[in-house]
Swiss-Prot record:
Species, as recorded: Teredinibacter turnerae (strain ATCC 39867 / T7901)
Gene: tig
Every PPIase FKBP-type domain range: 161-246
NCBIfam families: tig (TIGR00115)
Annotated protein name in UniProt: Trigger factor
GO MF terms held by the record: peptidyl-prolyl cis-trans isomerase activity; protein folding chaperone; ribosome binding
Amino acid sequence: MQVSIETTSGLERRLTVGIPAEIIDQEVEKRLKQAAKTVRINGFRKGKVPFKVVKQRFGEGVRQEVLGDTIQRSFYDAVRQESVRPAGQPSIEPKQMDEGKDVEYIATFEVYPEVELKELDNIEITRYDAEITDADIDKMVETLQKGQSSWEPVKRKSKKGDKVTIDFLGKIDGEAFDGGEAKGHQLELGSGSMIPGFEKGITGMKAGETQPINVTFPDDYHVEDLRSKDAEFEITVHEVLGEKLPKLDEEFYAKFGVTEGGEEKFREEVKSNMEREKQRAIKAKVKEQVMNALLESNSVDLPAALVQSEIGAMRQQMVQQYGQSAQNLDLQALLPDDMFKAQAERRTALALIVSEVVKKYEVKADKDIVRSLIEEAASTYEDPQEVINYYYSNEQLLANVEAAALEEKVVELLLEKATVTDATVSYDEVIKPQEPQAEEA
C-alpha cells in the first residue's frame, strides 16, 4: 500500500492511498468462490455452479463490496501509519477503480489540533456562599405555596399577579392592523408577555369594564411594520382571577413528604433542600469559572467536523423535547445550525482543552466521585437503588458519568493551582442561573 499525505489548510489533510490490484482481485475471487458453494442459479445444482457463471452474475457487485471494505480498512491503516488522528469521517474521492489496475483514492479529512496548555497557576476564582436566613425560607415556602395555588374570580380591581381574560382591538391612526385583535385572551398581569405599557394599562380594571389604552411598539418589535408605532387598544375585561394560596397545614406539608413534626419539621426539610441546591449552585459556578479561565488562557483550532457533530447532538437533544410532534417538522429550518453554533464551539473547545489537561496531568476518574454522582442522580427517584443498579449495568450511561467525574477531577486539580477568594452573598444570588457562555475559541 502506497501512502502520501499533505496539509491543505489548517487542520485539513489530504491522504492519497494506492492499493495493488492483486489485493482487490484476490479478495474478489475469494468471496466469489465462497458464494459459489451456496448460490442457487436455475439449471445448476447447489454448489455446482461454474466459477465463470458466478463471476459473470455476481462479480461486479462483489467487487464493489470489496472496494468499499478495502478502502475503509486501508484508510485507518494509513492514518495509523502516518500517526494522524482524524476528527470526523473522511471525504473519499475515487481516482482509479478500474478492474485490473491499482486502486487509488484521495481521502480528505480534518485532524485533532495540537493543544499547548498554558500555565494554570494564574487562575483566579471567586467562590460564593450564602447563609440561608428565615426570610429565604419564608420566600421558598411561598414559592411552594404558589405551586399548589388555585385561581378564583374576584370583583375587585385587577392587580399585578392576577390573571385576566380580555378582548382587545388595536388600531394605528384609526386603522386596525394584523395581529392586533383577540378575544378571550388570558393574560397574567406583570408577566411581561405583552408590549410595554399594555399590562400596566389593564392593571386596575375590573371585570365588565371597557376602556382604551395607549402604547408604543418597541423599536425592535418582531413585526417590522409596527416598530416605534403609537397604537390605541380598546380593552374589555371579562374576568379577573386572583391567586389563592393553600393554607400551611398538615395536608400541605404531607404533599412534600412531611407527615409529622408540623411546621417546624417542614421548614427544616425546606432548609435542607435549599442547602443542597445551594451547594450544587456553588459547585456549578466554580466549575464555570474554571472552564472560562481555561478558554481564556488556551486558544485552540476547532475541527469543523467536531463542531458539526456537537451541533447535531444539541439539536437532537432539543428534538427529544418535542416528542412525537417533531416527526413532521422541518427541523433543519426550525432549529438551524446558527442557533447552536456558538455553544457548540465552546463545548468542543473545552472538550479538547480538558482532554489535554487529563493527558498532561494523568488525571483518572475517581470511583468514589462516580458513585457519588450516580447516587445524586438516583436520589430523586422513588427507588434510588434500582436506578443505581441501572447506571452500573448500562455501559453508555456509566461512561457518561465517568466523563463527568473526570471533569470534576480536572476542576479539583485546577482549584489546587488557582487563587480562590471566598465571598458571601445572598441566597438568591448564589442560586441565580448562570448566564450562558458562548465565547468562540
